Design a protein with these regions (language model features):
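Compact beta-sheet-dominated globular domain cores
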Residues: 145, 149-158, 162-210
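An acidic, glycine-rich, mixed-charge low-complexity segment common to nucleic-acid enzymes
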Residues: 1-137, 142, 192-235
Length: 235
């Protein structure tokens, strides 16, 4: 007599196949998150200039479209500009990205989440790190909210000379990087302006122990009159 179990349909899906399906679903989910992060990056960061005031000094910072791919931490055969364009337009596909030992999935998930938090960090308490050294790269400055760090350098021309007067965000580290930096400072002010404006028009952050009166003169010269205390424009 045959056992009734003999007639039961067998599930032919192997553990390997289940794992493959899960990985495919993971890729679809991260593609969606990358698209959301790209939209925030485009709407709130690209096309703007940010000024961080710290230690009686300041630096100006920009975000470039071609750096978005590296910030996400994913593996892809797409060029940096095409990857960003596809992500921002929500046409990036799961087949166009991948993960490996150098670009692990879990780290990518955290990095993409951090990109979505960058705009918030630009308007909240943060620290400015100077002379950051990682295992593979050195950066002049970085900014951190204690959860992650944005590392930045000035771009170089073909002769190795610095280009422009702004630092460009080039890397996102899933750590605060205090131990990797030479010095750390509290940021007292953060300003922003559109690239087509000559002066800074928006105050994004003001430390509770700082005010607009004690800014360095060179910073005041970069601010629109609407941000300056009355009667102190020419102090």
């Amino acid at each position: 007599m045959l056992s009734s179990a003999y007639f039961l349909p067998k599930d032919k899906t192997t553990e390997k196949e289940i794992g493959t399906m899960a990985k495919a679903q993971d890729r679809k989910e991260i593609v969606s998150r990358i698209g959301d992060a790209a939209k925030l990056y485009r709407d709130r960061l690209v096309g703007k200039r940010f000024m961080y005031v710290f230690d009686g000094r300041y630096i100006e910072v920009i975000y470039k479209a071609e750096n978005f791919r590296h910030l996400t931490g994913v593996e892809t055969f797409l060029s940096a500009k095409r990857f960003y364009s596809y992500a921002a337009r929500k046409i990036l596909t799961a087949a166009q990205i991948g993960f490996n030992a150098k670009h692990p999935y879990d780290l990518c998930v955290r990095k993409v989440e951090h990109i979505g938090e960058v705009a918030t960090m630009a308007g909240s308490e943060s620290f400015l790190l100077e002379e950051i050294k990682t295992d593979t790269q050195s950066y002049k400055f970085g900014t951190t909210d204690l959860n992650f760090t944005l590392c930045m350098n000035k771009e170089l021309d073909d002769q190795g000379n610095e280009k422009g007067d702004c630092f460009v965000v080039q890397s996102l580290r899933d750590e605060d990087c205090f131990s990797r930096s030479k010095e750390a400072y509290s940021v007292t002010h953060i300003f922003s302006r559109a690239n087509d404006k000559k002066k800074y028009t928006d105050l994004l952050f003001l430390d509770k122990n700082a005010d607009m009166n004690n800014l360095p003169q060179e910073v005041k010269k970069l601010l629109d009159d609407c941000l300056l205390p009355q009667g102190r424009e020419n102090d």
